[in-house]
């Protein structure tokens, strides 16, 4: 017979899986976007669902990285991103992500993914290049997500 705690844990796990699936759908849609802004907006939607899933599953490094990515993409969409702000966001991700990391090398994968995408999104208007960077990021996130069971 299942205890209340086991039932609660399973409910949280299943809810996190639903949020992860919705996020995955949004990132897939973003890869077909016709403009950089549209791509960024779909990614923000993905990040919101994925951050919630990471928090539910104890993936704090991932949730932090995603939260900063929401800020980054929002500033990009509003055309308010500067090199200084981008540098500050990257430094915050590295420092706080390292502090919150409880998974060793695996915990650094979201940080690496986000920093590489931050640099790519800031330096190229080429959507095809950004799609390739998204694939690289998805591979890093896949390893992280499998570890936290997202």
Q: Each predicted region: which residue ranges?
A:
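Alpha-helical membrane-protein topology signature
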Residues: 2-150
